[in-house]
Amino acid sequence: MKNLFLLYAFLIFTCSCSDDANAQNNKDIFTIYLVRHSEKDLSANNLSDPPLTLCGVQRSENLSDFLKDVHLNIIYTTDYLRTKSTAFPTANSKGLEIELYDAQQLKDFSQLLIDRQQDALVVGHSNTTGVLAGLLTGEDIGAFDLDIYDRVYQVVIYKNKGRLHLLHVSVDCNE
């Protein structure tokens, strides 16, 4: 029930932002959603690029459901199986291709996101997602703990100034 309330509040806010015809026509407003990849399988043979756990797959599908009514122009991930697998259900449901970005070049990537002025989903890592949100908003936001997977950073950019909304989306894992 709590998740449903958060979703409705989120959708109301998103819709109220997109109803401003003047802002939409001028491309002055757009929204970037940043998430960390879902749970990775640390028991996998390839520890440098492990797949998602069953819970991670569920979380990724839940993210797609969460973003079902949200307009997206583009989806970005790093070049790892776990980030691409997290983004895949959303990309598939929206008919979008996944574009790769370099997590070692966050400052340049943040500027690209601002310059492109597109509604986007960015899937990253615990040490990049908060940092990127900070670059987009001018705030000092660092990395977060490795056991945190429920954060969605919603950054609304209006006239090149970002405003951050931190959302928490929990998943009841059936693993």
Region annotations inferred by a language model:
Residues 125:
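Conserved alpha/beta-hydrolase "nucleophile elbow" surrounding the catalytic nucleophile
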Residues 21-22, 28-113, 117, 129-132, ...:
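Active-site-proximal alpha-helix that buttresses catalytic centers in soluble enzyme cores
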Residues 13-16:
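C-terminal motif of bacterial Sec signal peptides marking the signal peptidase cleavage site
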Residues 6-11:
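Hydrophobic helical h-region of N-terminal Sec-dependent signal peptides
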